[in-house]
Amino acid sequence: XXHGEVEVSAXGKNLSPXV
C-alpha cells in the first residue's frame, strides 16, 4: 500500500485504475 495502490492478501499488489 501506498499511493494509488491496493495491498491484497492474495499474494501481491493490485494497481488501482486511476487512482
From Swiss-Prot:
Q: Where in the cell is it found?
A: Mitochondrion inner membrane
State the family named in the UniProt similarity comment for this chain.
Belongs to the cytochrome c oxidase IV family.
- One GO BP annotation here? oxidative phosphorylation
- Indicate the principal place this protein occupies in or around the cell: mitochondrion
Q: What are this entry's molecular-function GO terms? A: oxidoreductase activity
* Pathway annotation from the record: Energy metabolism; oxidative phosphorylation
Organism the protein comes from: Oncorhynchus mykiss (Rainbow trout)
> What functional role does this protein have?
Component of the cytochrome c oxidase, the last enzyme in the mitochondrial electron transport chain which drives oxidative phosphorylation. The respiratory chain contains 3 multisubunit complexes succinate dehydrogenase (complex II, CII), ubiquinol-cytochrome c oxidoreductase (cytochrome b-c1 complex, complex III, CIII) and cytochrome c oxidase (complex IV, CIV), that cooperate to transfer electrons derived from NADH and succinate to molecular oxygen, creating an electrochemical gradient over the inner membrane that drives transmembrane transport and the ATP synthase.
Regarding the membrane, this protein is recorded as: Single-pass membrane protein
Q: Its quaternary structure?
A: Component of the cytochrome c oxidase (complex IV, CIV), a multisubunit enzyme composed of 14 subunits. The complex is composed of a catalytic core of 3 subunits MT-CO1, MT-CO2 and MT-CO3, encoded in the mitochondrial DNA, and 11 supernumerary subunits COX4I, COX5A, COX5B, COX6A, COX6B, COX6C, COX7A, COX7B, COX7C, COX8 and NDUFA4, which are encoded in the nuclear genome.
May I have one GO cellular component term? mitochondrial inner membrane
Does the keyword DNA-binding feature in the UniProt annotation? Answer: no
Alphabetically ordered keywords of this record: Membrane, Mitochondrion, Mitochondrion inner membrane, Oxidoreductase
Taxonomically, the superkingdom here is Eukaryota
Keyword Mitochondrion listed = yes
**What protein am I looking at?**
Cytochrome c oxidase polypeptide 4, mitochondrial
Its ancestry begins with:
Eukaryota, Metazoa, Chordata, Craniata, Vertebrata
